[in-house]
Amino acid sequence: MAGGAVMTSTPTKPTVAFAHLGCEKNRVDTEHMVGLLAQAGYGVSTNENDAAVVVVNTCSFIQDAREESVRTLVGLAEQGKELIIAGCLAQHFQDELLESIPEAKAIVGTGDYQHIVEVLQRVEAGERVNRVSAVPTFVGDEHLPRQRTTDQAVAFLKVAEGCDYRCAFCIIPKLRGDQRSRPIESIVAEAHQLVEQGVQELILISQITTNYGLDLYGKPKLAELLRALGEVEIPWIRVHYAYPTGLTPEVLAAYREVPNVVPYLDLPLQHSHPEVLRAMNRPWQADVNDRLLDQIRDQLPDAVLRTTLIVGFPGETEEHFQHLMEFLRRQRFDHVGVFTFSPEDGTAAAELPNPVDPDVAQARKDALMALQQPISAERNHSWVSRTVDVLIEQHNPQTGQMIGRCARFAPEVDGEVHVQPGEDGQKAAPGTMVPVQITGADVYDLSGRIVGARDMVAAIRADA
């Protein structure tokens, strides 16, 4: 979570600090809790030194995330802080956390963060509070106060909560419940609110965004949602977490026809081999991987493709892994993230036989990343000499250099564009979007300079 205080008005009650861990969906929950407490008159800060009580919104997706959450909790407890533990770790281990951390004054589940003010008031009255619904059912909307903690120009917009799928390796349905979609009108209303705050990029998030609306309307409605959001005056709309089978012709047509939807597809494919996918409880996917990617590239020639993969899944053989290597070599993704399998208690995969040695899994991860790096470099180099819009996010007043992102880079997970002033010294402030001619590229990042009017006139005359 970004440093510094995030108060919107003079508080009338004590200051509460926040520590945020985990994914963008967790971040939105944090922002709602911040907004609710600020509305109730509490001061809110991201610096734990400002407060005696710290709300820690935790992650429990994989073992590394759990350990980071626990380290954060223990560190704050050793500083003498009183803790309100929220989020996925709280949903997962509520009783154990209350027993093992005396400084934990309250536990708040993933479907209960809207009660944060009541919880804090009960803590202040001397209670120890367990506010965890056994089955999360809540999903926030545009009426729930929210105070953003991200860069001024970027906002995550949660379109649904929970997940109806049961992938063998994933614990998310146990932590966040079944899918609950928001109405299209609610999402569009919040989008307008965010635009009024100066947001230039909306990132649509849920567990499976291509399944948006299935529970609410009886069929997926992502295409209709994108077309409705196309009426919102915002430069970029980005979609995260697209399940392969949900990329229907209607959805791809919306990508192609709605001008402010960027052609960036985040596809968590996980693997390529049919036997591994069957063990992951994703048996249908092997039939669509290559065909789907061909369709995307046919309909969206400038599409930027990101995927995430899992290696070391129980039973993964060297043959399975080589199949995945060949798939990656053939498909030439722009961006790839690779994870080694982490067995999660309560998931089907945790009970599977034939575990892969951790050293073998790590070696496979390293091999995939080594294969992908020159592909990513080549994909980036294909953008050299193009002029693209760049959203400026940082500016160094000493050097004049700026850092931003073009549409091919999502925040935090992808690269950056390092921007030099234009030939006449043109600069841009954070939160603004400017044309930049790309002059260089490496594995992860691009570099370029701002294009001024003189450059644009010269380019047009050269093309005439």
Swiss-Prot record:
Q: Where would you find this protein in the cell?
A: Cytoplasm
| Family affiliation | Belongs to the methylthiotransferase family. RimO subfamily.
- What is this protein called in UniProt? Ribosomal protein uS12 methylthiotransferase RimO
What function is annotated for this protein? Answer: Catalyzes the methylthiolation of an aspartic acid residue of ribosomal protein uS12.
Q: Name one GO molecular function term.
A: aspartic acid methylthiotransferase activity
Domain MTTase N-terminal intervals: 14-125
Q: Does the keyword S-adenosyl-L-methionine apply?
A: yes
Residues binding [4Fe-4S] cluster 2? C163, C167, C170
Pfam families listed in its UniProt record: Radical_SAM (PF04055), TRAM_2 (PF18693), UPF0004 (PF00919)
InterPro entries named among the record's database cross-references: Elp3/MiaA/NifB-like_rSAM, Methylthiotransferase, Methylthiotransferase_CS, Methylthiotransferase_N, Methylthiotransferase_N_sf, NA-bd_OB-fold, Ribosomal_uS12_MeSTrfase_RimO, rSAM
Reactions listed under catalytic activity: L-aspartate(89)-[ribosomal protein uS12]-hydrogen + (sulfur carrier)-SH + AH2 + 2 S-adenosyl-L-methionine = 3-methylsulfanyl-L-aspartate(89)-[ribosomal protein uS12]-hydrogen + (sulfur carrier)-H + 5'-deoxyadenosine + L-methionine + A + S-adenosyl-L-homocysteine + 2 H(+)
Name any GO cellular component annotation: cytosol
What is the species of this protein? Parasynechococcus marenigrum (strain WH8102)
Against NCBIfam families, the record matches this protein to: 30S ribosomal protein S12 methylthiotransferase RimO (TIGR01125), MiaB/RimO family radical SAM methylthiotransferase (TIGR00089)
